[in-house]
Protein backbone atom coordinates (compact mmCIF):
# COMPACT_ATOMS: atom_id res chain seq x y z
CA UNK A 1 0.00 0.00 0.00
CA UNK A 2 1.74 3.16 -1.21
CA UNK A 3 1.05 6.23 0.94
CA UNK A 4 1.58 9.91 0.29
CA UNK A 5 3.93 11.30 2.94
CA UNK A 6 3.55 14.88 4.22
CA UNK A 7 6.42 17.40 4.10
CA UNK A 8 7.34 16.81 7.75
CA UNK A 9 7.90 13.47 9.50
CA UNK A 10 8.99 12.77 13.07
CA UNK A 11 11.65 10.22 13.93
CA UNK A 12 11.45 8.28 17.21
CA UNK A 13 13.37 5.12 16.30
CA UNK A 14 16.84 6.61 16.88
CA UNK A 15 16.54 7.01 20.67
CA UNK A 16 17.94 4.30 22.92
CA UNK A 17 15.26 3.70 25.54
CA UNK A 18 11.60 2.84 25.12
CA UNK A 19 10.56 5.65 27.48
CA UNK A 20 12.48 8.20 25.38
CA UNK A 21 10.81 6.98 22.21
CA UNK A 22 7.39 6.98 23.88
CA UNK A 23 7.88 10.58 25.03
CA UNK A 24 8.71 11.68 21.47
CA UNK A 25 5.60 10.00 20.06
CA UNK A 26 3.37 11.58 22.71
CA UNK A 27 4.87 15.03 22.15
CA UNK A 28 4.60 14.70 18.37
CA UNK A 29 0.92 13.80 18.61
CA UNK A 30 0.26 16.75 20.92
CA UNK A 31 1.94 19.01 18.36
CA UNK A 32 -0.28 17.73 15.56
CA UNK A 33 2.20 15.58 13.62
CA UNK A 34 0.64 12.58 11.91
CA UNK A 35 3.53 10.48 10.51
CA UNK A 36 6.09 9.02 12.92
CA UNK A 37 8.97 6.58 12.35
CA UNK A 38 9.10 3.78 14.95
CA UNK A 39 11.12 0.68 15.70
CA UNK A 40 9.38 -2.61 14.81
CA UNK A 41 9.43 -3.67 18.47
CA UNK A 42 7.59 -0.53 19.60
CA UNK A 43 4.19 -1.88 18.57
CA UNK A 44 2.57 -0.59 21.77
CA UNK A 45 3.31 3.01 20.79
CA UNK A 46 0.78 2.75 17.98
CA UNK A 47 -1.96 3.00 20.61
CA UNK A 48 -0.93 6.43 21.94
CA UNK A 49 -3.13 8.07 19.31
CA UNK A 50 -4.33 7.90 15.76
CA UNK A 51 -1.37 8.43 13.44
CA UNK A 52 0.58 6.79 10.63
CA UNK A 53 3.34 4.59 12.05
CA UNK A 54 6.25 3.90 9.67
CA UNK A 55 8.55 1.11 10.81
CA UNK A 56 12.32 1.41 10.35
CA UNK A 57 13.39 -2.20 9.78
CA UNK A 58 17.10 -1.82 9.20
CA UNK A 59 17.39 0.41 6.15
CA UNK A 60 13.89 -0.39 4.97
CA UNK A 61 10.91 1.81 5.80
CA UNK A 62 7.79 -0.34 6.08
CA UNK A 63 4.08 0.48 6.12
CA UNK A 64 1.39 -2.22 6.25
CA UNK A 65 3.98 -4.83 5.31
CA UNK A 66 5.19 -2.99 2.21
CA UNK A 67 8.50 -1.21 1.71
CA UNK A 68 7.75 2.45 1.07
CA UNK A 69 11.30 3.75 1.26
CA UNK A 70 14.87 3.51 2.47
CA UNK A 71 16.56 5.22 5.42
CA UNK A 72 20.22 5.81 4.61
CA UNK A 73 22.86 7.01 7.07
CA UNK A 74 25.17 9.20 5.01
CA UNK A 75 28.78 9.30 6.17
CA UNK A 76 30.76 9.67 2.95
CA UNK A 77 31.06 9.20 -0.79
CA UNK A 78 30.20 5.49 -0.72
CA UNK A 79 26.81 6.11 0.88
CA UNK A 80 26.22 9.02 -1.48
CA UNK A 81 26.64 6.70 -4.46
CA UNK A 82 24.20 4.28 -2.83
CA UNK A 83 21.74 7.14 -2.48
CA UNK A 84 22.08 7.99 -6.17
CA UNK A 85 21.45 4.35 -7.09
CA UNK A 86 18.05 4.47 -5.36
CA UNK A 87 16.70 7.15 -7.69
CA UNK A 88 13.37 5.90 -9.10
CA UNK A 89 13.94 2.56 -7.34
CA UNK A 90 12.01 3.40 -4.14
CA UNK A 91 9.11 5.80 -3.47
CA UNK A 92 10.91 7.63 -0.66
CA UNK A 93 14.53 8.10 0.37
CA UNK A 94 15.35 9.46 3.83
CA UNK A 95 18.90 10.73 4.22
CA UNK A 96 20.37 10.95 7.72
CA UNK A 97 23.60 12.98 7.37
CA UNK A 98 26.39 12.43 9.87
CA UNK A 99 27.65 15.96 9.48
CA UNK A 100 25.50 18.65 7.92
CA UNK A 101 28.48 20.87 7.15
CA UNK A 102 29.99 18.46 4.63
CA UNK A 103 26.88 16.95 3.09
CA UNK A 104 26.53 17.96 -0.58
CA UNK A 105 22.82 18.63 -0.27
CA UNK A 106 22.79 20.50 -3.56
CA UNK A 107 24.04 17.40 -5.40
CA UNK A 108 21.26 15.29 -3.92
CA UNK A 109 18.53 17.73 -4.79
CA UNK A 110 19.79 18.27 -8.33
CA UNK A 111 20.12 14.51 -8.95
CA UNK A 112 16.58 13.80 -7.75
CA UNK A 113 14.76 16.68 -9.44
CA UNK A 114 11.74 15.37 -11.35
CA UNK A 115 12.46 11.86 -10.05
CA UNK A 116 9.82 9.39 -8.92
CA UNK A 117 11.66 9.14 -5.59
CA UNK A 118 10.92 11.75 -2.92
CA UNK A 119 13.94 12.86 -0.89
CA UNK A 120 13.64 13.61 2.83
CA UNK A 121 16.47 14.98 4.98
CA UNK A 122 16.85 14.31 8.72
CA UNK A 123 17.27 17.56 10.65
CA UNK A 124 17.87 18.48 14.28
CA UNK A 125 17.35 22.25 14.22
CA UNK A 126 14.95 24.69 12.53
CA UNK A 127 17.93 26.21 10.72
CA UNK A 128 18.76 22.85 9.13
CA UNK A 129 15.10 22.44 8.20
CA UNK A 130 14.95 25.78 6.41
CA UNK A 131 18.20 25.02 4.60
CA UNK A 132 16.81 21.69 3.43
CA UNK A 133 13.62 23.33 2.14
CA UNK A 134 15.41 26.24 0.44
CA UNK A 135 18.54 24.72 -1.11
CA UNK A 136 18.70 25.39 -4.86
CA UNK A 137 15.34 27.21 -4.52
CA UNK A 138 13.32 24.00 -4.93
CA UNK A 139 14.59 22.28 -1.78
CA UNK A 140 14.04 18.67 -0.77
CA UNK A 141 10.62 17.03 -0.76
CA UNK A 142 10.45 16.96 3.02
CA UNK A 143 12.27 16.77 6.33
CA UNK A 144 12.42 14.26 9.16
CA UNK A 145 12.71 15.97 12.53
CA UNK A 146 15.13 13.95 14.65
CA UNK A 147 14.74 15.24 18.22
CA UNK A 148 16.84 14.33 21.25
CA UNK A 149 13.84 14.91 23.50
CA UNK A 150 10.23 16.19 23.51
CA UNK A 151 11.30 19.78 24.20
CA UNK A 152 13.13 19.91 20.85
CA UNK A 153 9.86 19.74 18.90
CA UNK A 154 8.71 23.13 20.22
CA UNK A 155 11.45 24.89 18.24
CA UNK A 156 9.92 23.63 15.00
CA UNK A 157 6.50 25.22 15.52
CA UNK A 158 7.26 27.98 13.02
CA UNK A 159 8.55 25.55 10.42
CA UNK A 160 5.10 24.04 9.90
CA UNK A 161 3.86 27.23 8.31
CA UNK A 162 7.07 27.38 6.26
CA UNK A 163 6.27 24.06 4.54
CA UNK A 164 4.76 26.11 1.75
CA UNK A 165 6.54 29.03 0.10
CA UNK A 166 5.26 32.58 0.13
CA UNK A 167 2.85 33.09 -2.75
CA UNK A 168 3.24 36.48 -4.40
CA UNK A 169 -0.10 37.22 -6.02
CA UNK A 170 -0.57 39.33 -9.12
CA UNK A 171 -3.28 41.89 -9.74
CA UNK A 172 -6.16 41.70 -12.19
CA UNK A 173 -8.43 44.57 -13.23
CA UNK A 174 -12.15 44.12 -12.60
CA UNK A 175 -13.94 44.50 -15.95
CA UNK A 176 -17.45 43.27 -15.21
CA UNK A 177 -19.74 42.77 -12.22
CA UNK A 178 -23.23 41.38 -12.73
CA UNK A 179 -25.88 39.78 -10.56
CA UNK A 180 -26.97 36.22 -11.24
CA UNK A 181 -30.05 34.33 -10.15
CA UNK A 182 -29.97 31.70 -7.42
CA UNK A 183 -27.20 29.12 -7.34
CA UNK A 184 -25.59 26.56 -5.04
CA UNK A 185 -22.80 28.17 -3.06
CA UNK A 186 -20.28 26.53 -0.75
CA UNK A 187 -19.48 27.90 2.70
CA UNK A 188 -16.33 26.44 4.29
CA UNK A 189 -16.11 26.50 8.10
CA UNK A 190 -12.55 25.71 9.18
CA UNK A 191 -11.13 24.55 12.49
CA UNK A 192 -8.92 27.67 12.63
CA UNK A 193 -9.41 31.34 13.43
CA UNK A 194 -8.42 33.13 10.26
CA UNK A 195 -6.88 36.59 10.16
CA UNK A 196 -8.35 39.64 8.49
CA UNK A 197 -7.27 39.48 4.87
CA UNK A 198 -6.51 35.76 5.06
CA UNK A 199 -8.32 33.60 2.57
CA UNK A 200 -8.40 30.82 0.03
CA UNK A 201 -7.55 30.78 -3.66
CA UNK A 202 -10.69 30.13 -5.70
CA UNK A 203 -11.85 30.70 -9.26
CA UNK A 204 -13.88 29.52 -12.22
CA UNK A 205 -10.68 28.80 -14.18
CA UNK A 206 -7.81 26.81 -12.68
CA UNK A 207 -5.38 29.19 -14.39
CA UNK A 208 -6.61 32.13 -12.31
CA UNK A 209 -7.60 31.81 -8.67
CA UNK A 210 -8.94 34.82 -6.75
CA UNK A 211 -8.14 35.49 -3.09
CA UNK A 212 -11.52 35.05 -1.37
CA UNK A 213 -11.11 36.33 2.18
CA UNK A 214 -12.43 35.00 5.47
CA UNK A 215 -15.45 36.50 7.22
CA UNK A 216 -13.23 38.00 9.91
CA UNK A 217 -14.79 41.45 9.64
CA UNK A 218 -17.73 42.74 11.65
CA UNK A 219 -20.80 43.73 9.65
CA UNK A 220 -23.73 45.99 10.44
CA UNK A 221 -26.05 43.02 10.13
CA UNK A 222 -24.04 40.01 11.30
CA UNK A 223 -21.19 39.16 13.66
CA UNK A 224 -17.84 38.11 12.26
CA UNK A 225 -17.21 34.45 11.53
CA UNK A 226 -13.38 34.34 11.54
CA UNK A 227 -13.36 30.59 10.95
CA UNK A 228 -15.35 30.87 7.71
CA UNK A 229 -14.64 31.38 4.02
CA UNK A 230 -17.78 31.83 1.93
CA UNK A 231 -16.08 30.29 -1.06
CA UNK A 232 -18.49 30.64 -3.96
CA UNK A 233 -20.29 28.53 -6.53
CA UNK A 234 -20.04 24.73 -6.50
CA UNK A 235 -18.25 24.57 -9.87
CA UNK A 236 -15.29 26.65 -8.68
CA UNK A 237 -11.74 25.39 -8.25
CA UNK A 238 -9.95 25.72 -4.90
CA UNK A 239 -6.22 25.26 -4.29
CA UNK A 240 -5.20 22.38 -1.98
CA UNK A 241 -2.02 21.89 0.11
CA UNK A 242 -0.47 19.42 -2.34
CA UNK A 243 -0.73 21.91 -5.20
CA UNK A 244 -3.74 20.24 -6.80
CA UNK A 245 -7.18 21.77 -7.12
CA UNK A 246 -10.58 20.43 -6.18
CA UNK A 247 -14.06 21.53 -7.10
CA UNK A 248 -15.82 23.23 -4.22
CA UNK A 249 -18.54 20.61 -4.54
CA UNK A 250 -15.96 17.98 -3.52
CA UNK A 251 -14.88 19.64 -0.27
CA UNK A 252 -16.02 17.90 2.92
CA UNK A 253 -15.36 17.98 6.65
CA UNK A 254 -12.01 16.44 7.50
CA UNK A 255 -10.32 17.77 4.36
CA UNK A 256 -7.22 19.95 4.50
CA UNK A 257 -7.18 23.18 2.51
CA UNK A 258 -4.61 25.86 1.81
CA UNK A 259 -5.04 29.31 3.31
CA UNK A 260 -3.01 32.38 2.34
CA UNK A 261 -2.20 34.75 5.18
CA UNK A 262 -1.86 38.54 4.74
CA UNK A 263 1.96 38.33 4.81
CA UNK A 264 1.93 35.95 1.83
CA UNK A 265 2.69 32.80 3.80
CA UNK A 266 0.52 29.74 3.30
CA UNK A 267 -0.77 27.35 5.93
CA UNK A 268 -3.01 24.32 5.99
CA UNK A 269 -6.37 24.48 7.73
CA UNK A 270 -8.77 21.66 8.51
CA UNK A 271 -12.35 21.75 7.31
CA UNK A 272 -14.81 21.33 10.16
CA UNK A 273 -18.03 21.75 8.19
CA UNK A 274 -19.20 22.54 4.67
CA UNK A 275 -22.57 24.10 3.92
CA UNK A 276 -24.01 24.12 0.41
CA UNK A 277 -27.02 26.41 0.22
CA UNK A 278 -29.04 28.15 -2.47
CA UNK A 279 -28.21 31.84 -2.53
CA UNK A 280 -28.26 34.80 -4.96
CA UNK A 281 -24.96 34.88 -6.84
CA UNK A 282 -22.62 37.50 -8.27
CA UNK A 283 -20.44 37.18 -11.36
CA UNK A 284 -17.09 39.02 -11.25
CA UNK A 285 -14.85 39.21 -14.29
CA UNK A 286 -11.27 40.49 -14.29
CA UNK A 287 -8.47 40.80 -16.81
CA UNK A 288 -4.78 39.99 -16.30
CA UNK A 289 -2.02 39.45 -18.83
CA UNK A 290 -4.39 40.10 -21.70
CA UNK A 291 -6.75 37.30 -20.64
CA UNK A 292 -10.14 37.39 -18.97
CA UNK A 293 -11.00 35.34 -15.89
CA UNK A 294 -13.96 35.08 -13.54
CA UNK A 295 -15.23 34.00 -10.17
CA UNK A 296 -18.83 33.45 -9.02
CA UNK A 297 -19.53 34.36 -5.38
CA UNK A 298 -22.55 34.84 -3.18
CA UNK A 299 -24.09 38.28 -3.54
CA UNK A 300 -23.64 39.44 0.06
CA UNK A 301 -21.69 42.23 1.76
CA UNK A 302 -19.81 39.76 3.99
CA UNK A 303 -17.97 38.31 0.97
CA UNK A 304 -14.63 40.01 0.38
CA UNK A 305 -11.88 39.76 -2.20
CA UNK A 306 -8.22 40.47 -1.51
CA UNK A 307 -6.99 43.70 -3.10
CA UNK A 308 -3.88 45.92 -2.77
CA UNK A 309 -5.92 48.15 -0.42
CA UNK A 310 -7.11 45.27 1.75
CA UNK A 311 -10.10 42.95 1.79
CA UNK A 312 -12.94 44.65 -0.11
CA UNK A 313 -16.59 43.62 0.07
CA UNK A 314 -18.10 42.53 -3.24
CA UNK A 315 -20.84 45.09 -2.49
CA UNK A 316 -18.23 47.86 -2.73
CA UNK A 317 -16.22 46.43 -5.62
CA UNK A 318 -16.23 48.58 -8.76
CA UNK A 319 -15.16 48.31 -12.40
CA UNK A 320 -11.48 49.22 -12.66
CA UNK A 321 -10.59 48.00 -9.16
CA UNK A 322 -7.55 45.77 -8.76
CA UNK A 323 -7.97 42.34 -7.13
CA UNK A 324 -5.36 39.75 -6.18
CA UNK A 325 -5.12 36.59 -8.27
CA UNK A 326 -2.82 33.60 -8.63
CA UNK A 327 -2.03 32.88 -12.28
CA UNK A 328 -0.62 29.70 -13.78
CA UNK A 329 -0.22 28.34 -17.30
CA UNK A 330 -1.44 25.02 -18.66
CA UNK A 331 -4.49 23.08 -17.59
CA UNK A 332 -5.67 20.65 -14.94
CA UNK A 333 -6.64 17.01 -15.23
CA UNK A 334 -8.30 15.57 -12.11
CA UNK A 335 -6.81 18.50 -10.20
CA UNK A 336 -3.22 17.99 -11.37
CA UNK A 337 -1.38 20.51 -13.54
CA UNK A 338 -0.89 19.52 -17.16
CA UNK A 339 1.33 21.15 -19.78
CA UNK A 340 -1.43 21.42 -22.33
CA UNK A 341 -3.28 24.04 -24.31
CA UNK A 342 -6.67 24.68 -22.79
CA UNK A 343 -9.31 27.40 -23.08
CA UNK A 344 -11.67 27.90 -20.14
CA UNK A 345 -14.37 30.54 -20.52
Curated annotation (Swiss-Prot):
> What UniProt keywords apply to this chain's record, in alphabetical order?
Amino-acid biosynthesis, Aromatic amino acid biosynthesis, NAD, Oxidoreductase
Matching entries from InterPro entries are given as: DHQ_synth
**Top enzyme class:** oxidoreductase
- Note the SS bond partners: none
Name its GO BP terms in alphabetical order: amino acid biosynthetic process; aromatic amino acid family biosynthetic process
Q: Which domain of life is it from?
A: Archaea
Question: EC?
Answer: 1.4.1.24
Gene Ontology molecular function terms on file: 3-dehydroquinate synthase activity; dehydroquinate synthase activity; NAD binding
The reaction(s) this protein catalyses: 2-amino-2,3,7-trideoxy-D-lyxo-hept-6-ulosonate + NAD(+) + H2O = 3-dehydroquinate + NH4(+) + NADH + H(+)
Q: Which Pfam families match?
A: DHQS (PF01959)
Give the protein family: Belongs to the archaeal-type DHQ synthase family.
Q: What does this protein do?
A: Catalyzes the oxidative deamination and cyclization of 2-amino-3,7-dideoxy-D-threo-hept-6-ulosonic acid (ADH) to yield 3-dehydroquinate (DHQ), which is fed into the canonical shikimic pathway of aromatic amino acid biosynthesis.
Q: What is this protein called?
A: 3-dehydroquinate synthase
Provide the species name: Methanocorpusculum labreanum (strain ATCC 43576 / DSM 4855 / Z)
